[in-house]
C-alpha cells in the first residue's frame, strides 16, 4: 500500500486565478481526505486563495520551493477542521505534514486581521521549510490543543498591527482550547498544546512595504487553572528586531530554550505565572488563584545589541513560586541588557557576572 502522490494541477490549478486555484486546492485536499496518507504536490507558481483551505487526517502538503499560496481574501489560508463540526481533545484531523513553499497572507493588498495556519485538536503536526509572510494582526500559526508539534527550518517574515491593538500577537502561538482563543472550530474543552519542538527557524521582517518584524516570536497568552504548556523545546533559532519580548511562555512546565540568537530585540525571554482573572479560572468557570511554572531551562543563548526590556524576565505573583529554573552559559553583549528574577524556588545561575541581575523573593 504505497503512499499516493498527486499533483494539484490534476485538479485544475491554474495560477494567479483565485476561483480556479482555491477550488483545485480544496478538491485535492478532499481527495486526500478520502485516501488517507496522500501527498499533494504543489508545483512552482503563484496560486491565489480566496477562502480557507481545509486539510484533513493524514495528509502531506508538499510545495515546490517556488510555490506560493497567496491569500486573496479576508480569512485564514489553511485550517485542519470545518466550522460547524465537533472536535474534542487531540482527536481532530491529525498527522498533518506541510513542507516547502511560501504561505503569503498578502497583508499589503488584503490588510485584514487573520492567521495563516490554524491547527487545533490534533496530534502530530509537522511544518518544515515553509516561509510565512506578511500577516496582519494574527499569527503565522495558532497551534491550539496540539499534542506533538514540530517546526523546523521555517521563516516567519513580516507582521503589521495597523490599529496597535494586537501588541500580544505571536508568530507562533501555543494555545489552549478555551472560549475566544480559537474561533475556527472545535470544542472549548481546555485541550492544551504540549510536546513541541521549534528549531532552526528565523523570525524577522519581510521586504514588503508597511510590514515590520514580529512583536513576539513564540508564546502564549491564554491559560486555565491546572493546565500547563508542557515539554516545549525552542532551540537554534534566530530572532531579529522583535518589537517586544521575543519569547513569552506562560505557566509552562518542562521548557528548554537554548542555542538561540536574540538580535536587536526589544526584549529576550519573559516567563510569567498566571496571577488571576480568566486565565486562573478552572474549566467550570470558577476563579482559583495564582499558579506558576516548573522546570525552565535557559542556556547557551546569545543576546546581541540594545534591549529596552530585559534579556530575561521571570516573574510570579502572590508568593507562589516558579520552581527549578536554570540559567546557564548565555552570552550577553550590551550594557543595556539585564535579568530580572522574582518569586523562584530552586534557581541555578552559572557565572554570568557581566550582566545586571535583580533578584526578588528567591529561595
Task: Give names to the regions the model predicted.
Residues 26-31, 47-62, 68-99, 105-124, ...:
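Extracellular beta-strand-rich solenoid/capping regions of secreted or surface-exposed proteins
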Residues 29-33, 103, 107-125, 207-210, ...:
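Right-handed parallel beta-helix
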Residues 87-90, 164-166, 178-191, 219, ...:
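Intrinsically disordered, low-complexity Ser/Thr- and acidic-rich flexible linkers and loops
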Residues 56-59, 64, 93, 98, ...:
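Parallel beta-helix/beta-solenoid
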Residues 8-43:
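Acidic Gly/Asp/Thr-rich repetitive segments characteristic of extracellular carbohydrate-active
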Amino acid at each position: 500500500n504505497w503512499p499516493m502522490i498527486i499533483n494539484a494541477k490534476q485538479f485544475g490549478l491554474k495560477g494567479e486565478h483565485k476561483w480556479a486555484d482555491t477550488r483545485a486546492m480544496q478538491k485535492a485536499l478532499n481527495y486526500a481526505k478520502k485516501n488517507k496518507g496522500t501527498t499533494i504536490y504543489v508545483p512552482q507558481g503563484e496560486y491565489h486563495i480566496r477562502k480557507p483551505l481545509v486539510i484533513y487526517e493524514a495528509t502531506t502538503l508538499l510545495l515546490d520551493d517556488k510555490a506560493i499560496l497567496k491569500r486573496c481574501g479576508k480569512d485564514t489560508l489553511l485550517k485542519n477542521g470545518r466550522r460547524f463540526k465537533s472536535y474534542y481533545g487531540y482527536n481532530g484531523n491529525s498527522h498533518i505534514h506541510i513542507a516547502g513553499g511560501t504561505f503569503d497572507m498578502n497583508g499589503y493588498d488584503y490588510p485584514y486581521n487573520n492567521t495563516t495556519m490554524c491547527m487545533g485538536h490534533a496530534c502530530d503536526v509537522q511544518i518544515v521549510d515553509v516561509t510565512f509572510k506578511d500577516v496582519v494582526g494574527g499569527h503565522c500559526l495558532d497551534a491550539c490543543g496540539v499534542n506533538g508539534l514540530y517546526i523546523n527550518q521555517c521563516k516567519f517574515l513580516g507582521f503589521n498591527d495597523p490599529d496597535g491593538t494586537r501588541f500580544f500577537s505571536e508568530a507562533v502561538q501555543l494555545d489552549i482550547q478555551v472560549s475566544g482563543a480559537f474561533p475556527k472550530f472545535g470544542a472549548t474543552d481546555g485541550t492544551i498544546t504540549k510536546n513541541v519542538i521549534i528549531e532552526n527557524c528565523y523570525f524577522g521582517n519581510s521586504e514588503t512595504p508597511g510590514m515590520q518584524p514580529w512583536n513576539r516570536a513564540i508564546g502564549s497568552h491564554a491559560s486555565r487553572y491546572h493546565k500547563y504548556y508542557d515539554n516545549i523545546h525552542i532551540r537554534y533559532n534566530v530572532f531579529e528586531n522583535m518589537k517586544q519580548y521575543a519569547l513569552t511562555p506562560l505557566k509552562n512546565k518542562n521548557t528548554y530554550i537554548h542555542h538561540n540568537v536574540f538580535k536587536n530585540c526589544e526584549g529576550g525571554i519573559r516567563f510569567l505565572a498566571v496571577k488571576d482573572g480568566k486565565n486562573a479560572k478552572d474549566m467550570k468557570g470558577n476563579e482559583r488563584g495564582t499558579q506558576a511554572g516548573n522546570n525552565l531551562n535557559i542556556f547557551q543563548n546569545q543576546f546581541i545589541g540594545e534591549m529596552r526590556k530585559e534579556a530575561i524576565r521571570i516573574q510570579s505573583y502572590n508568593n507562589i513560586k516558579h520552581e527549578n529554573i536554570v540559567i546557564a552559559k548565555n552570552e550577553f553583549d550590551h550594557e543595556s541588557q539585564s535579568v530580572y528574577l522574582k518569586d523562584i524556588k530552586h534557581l541555578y545561575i552559572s557565572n554570568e557576572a557581566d550582566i545586571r541581575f535583580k533578584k526578588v523573593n528567591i529561595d
